[in-house]
């Protein structure tokens, strides 16, 4: 009887260990640990999903997020989101970040011809940072002169701005050319975020 009882206990132990699933490694879950990402939003009228979805993914993978804008007052999204920026765009230092991400929405026009935004874009390329923009924000990159000869996409209304800046406009939902990643609107926000994460993980 005792022997049978012992055999039953051993069988239960072996069965439970065989069914146990290995815990996911922290490295896999936090693939962006130690990475610093600057997200640039318009003071008024940034696109909510284009900010929220990438930020959620970046933070879930361990990245540190900083938000910059043209004002430190609470920024308002076109769908009602409210975000308190961490610093003024003019006070940021490109070398502090691994990626610079321009968020779109109608308000993103404020950076199209902004010399501060252009200087950030140009410095990001010079320092080999991941540089990304979504919706109408890729027009800022084009006007800053960094898309010449590059494959890029944008919200369809600004296709001509990209072409005028020398880009090869592809009309893709998400486009990557080296360390420059562009996307054409909120429906591409999740994939846009994945491409940025992939570039940072390389």
Positions of predicted regions on the chain:
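Positively charged n-region of N-terminal signal peptides that target proteins for export
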Residues: 1-4
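Bacterial N-terminal signal peptides
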Residues: 7-16
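Residues that line or immediately flank small-molecule/substrate-binding pockets and catalytic motifs
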Residues: 8, 104, 154-156
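Extended, subdomain-level signal for the structured scaffold at the beginning of enzyme domains
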Residues: 19-127, 131, 140-144, 161-171, ...
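A short beta-strand/loop micro-motif in the catalytic core of glycosyltransferases
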Residues: 131-132, 152
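Catalytic nucleophile serine of serine hydrolases
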Residues: 135
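Short hydrophobic/aromatic-enriched beta-strand-loop microsegments
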Residues: 148-156, 169-172
């Amino acid at each position: 009887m005792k022997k049978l009882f012992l055999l039953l206990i051993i069988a239960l132990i072996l069965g439970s260990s065989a069914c146990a699933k290995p815990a996911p490694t922290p490295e896999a879950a936090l693939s962006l640990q130690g990475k610093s990402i600057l997200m640039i939003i318009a003071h008024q009228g940034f696109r909510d999903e284009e900010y929220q979805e990438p930020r959620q993914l970046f933070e879930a993978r361990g990245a540190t997020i900083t938000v910059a804008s043209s004002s430190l007052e609470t920024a308002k999204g076109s769908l009602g989101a409210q975000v308190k920026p961490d610093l003024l765009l003019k006070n940021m230092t490109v070398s502090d970040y691994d990626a610079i991400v321009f968020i779109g929405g109608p308000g993103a026009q404020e950076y199209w011809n902004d010399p501060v935004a252009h200087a950030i874009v140009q410095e990001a390329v010079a320092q080999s940072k991941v540089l990304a923009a979504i919706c109408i924000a890729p027009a800022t990159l084009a006007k800053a002169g960094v898309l010449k000869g590059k494959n890029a996409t944008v919200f369809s209304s600004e296709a001509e701005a990209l072409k005028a800046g020398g880009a090869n406009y592809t009309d893709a939902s998400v486009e990557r050319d080296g360390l420059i990643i562009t996307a054409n609107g909120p429906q591409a926000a999740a994939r846009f975020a994945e491409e940025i994460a992939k570039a940072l993980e390389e």
